[in-house]
Amino acid sequence: MSGMQTGPHAQPALATTVVADLDALFSVDGIKIPGPDARVVLVLDGHHTIKYHRLGLPAKPPASGKPVLRFEGGEHIAIGDNTLLRFSADSAPIEAWKVALHLPNGLTLSYGQIAALGGDFYGIPERPIADGATAQERVERFAAAFDSLAVLPASRDEAGRILAVMQREIAAANQAIKDGRQPHEAYDQLGDSLSEEWNKITGGGSFVSPMFPLGRYLKLAASNWDHFGEWALLAYIAGHTGALHQAMKARASGDVGQLELAYAMNAFADHFLTDLFSAGHVRVPRKAIKDNVTPADLGSLISRFMHDEDSKYGLVLRNAQGDTWRGYGDKRYFDTIDVANRKQIAEAVQKSADEVFQAFNTGTLPTPDSYGALRVAADLQAVVEDQVPGNFAPLFAMRNGKLMRRADVSNLNDQAQIDNWWGWSTYLLLKNYTPNKPSGYLEAPAAAPSIHADGWQTQVPSPPNWLPGHAVRYAVSMVNGLNESYIGPWSDYAELNDRFQPTLTVPVDNSGKSTSRHLFRQFRGGSPELIAALAAGTTTYIDHHQ
């Protein structure tokens, strides 16, 4: 548990601190320095990212990196709280959101809340889990990270304040869903506001900037390779191993409270597991960029551009079970295009939790190479080595021990790579770039489905949805294999008074780029749901779905 800072950090002397935008370095006037002892703090305003943390880049020493995006807290809560937990072989499983997990310091949290807090808000910034030299050391590092949430007394109040801010994120995403908008648009509107508050809650911020100095939240983000690729895999294995051993202790003691602790540890570990499904975390060589680009801050900074590309356009993923699907990245978990990825994540997290109970119930431990969740997770090597057809060219990649860059950074389809590139010049190319869309990208349709005025199938209501006083509307997306567009506009809501189950006219793709369409339905006040896959030539659909 050493290395955890819980109170306000000692503030640096700010009288000779100059805070300026990074781009001012490249302007005609430059940055005016008041004296030889002045400290320059460079900050960055968003150019392309949906949301990223605003972090100072000190002129010297370049010790910490630019935080890179991750699944948002609300997404982790939803993933974790939909999991089923068992406490007895004779009892039915319980939805995780109904289960209060009691931690040693008195905190009571749900599985999803712990998954949201793990790694992003709690951990030891200077001791990334995956940096442990051995499997045992990684388990020990995970335990220290978990204890920073579960054992430290100060976390009782702090975690509640973090979650209170996170609730605003959740409310914004929920409202977007009800409005029929894509939730990532809500995250876009929030900007950096929540990150500023989280930085202050975790000991950072000052009158100069809410993001300077760094609190634990931003320090963790600056060394967050535990959330990327092979490092996320190592972090999950360490945490899941620790949780399984805790389940064995619970079995030996017969204490259900000890099983709660095992589930809590596993929820913390599942944060890293779910990162293995976030496209912007799968193939970004996060640690290699940090280690090879000088200063390290700059390497962390340019990592985010690749993260954002992969998150926005998604990657084709495959796993050991033979599944192939397209997954998108942070802030897109609830978007209509990420349905297939949500199913894979849910399966992996459920397998992870089930193994904790199996260890408790049977007294046997699986070996790390047989962990069930890892058969569901993306095959990292296949994606990194471009063995999966359908993915656009990576911005950065390790090839034969060299850190390569896409030759034309603005062309997502440029497979040419170069090794003679520099961090600062690459940043200048990226900071205002407008990359083209990848091959196979499908534009959202311009028209909405329409309801036939005389096409209603019945006047008999049927619960839970086809009831008087309800209203329904429809939208469609274009599909070609694993490529799918965002949905087009929604039809107007049709009031359901004495008519139910309509007949629809569904727009077709006149461009010929799609081979099928997905039809979505939304009842007023509810969430959009995928109800049908339609062949390219089908123009009529009768909605008999409940």
List each language-model region with its residue ranges.
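N-terminal, motif-rich segments that launch catalysis or mediate targeting to/interaction with membranes
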Residues: 3-264, 282-439
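Active-site alpha-helical segments that house and flank conserved acidic catalytic motifs
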Residues: 262-278
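Short loop/turn segments at secondary-structure transitions that flank enzyme active sites
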Residues: 276-282, 482, 525
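Disordered, low-complexity "stalk" and linker segments at domain junctions of extracellular
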Residues: 440-546
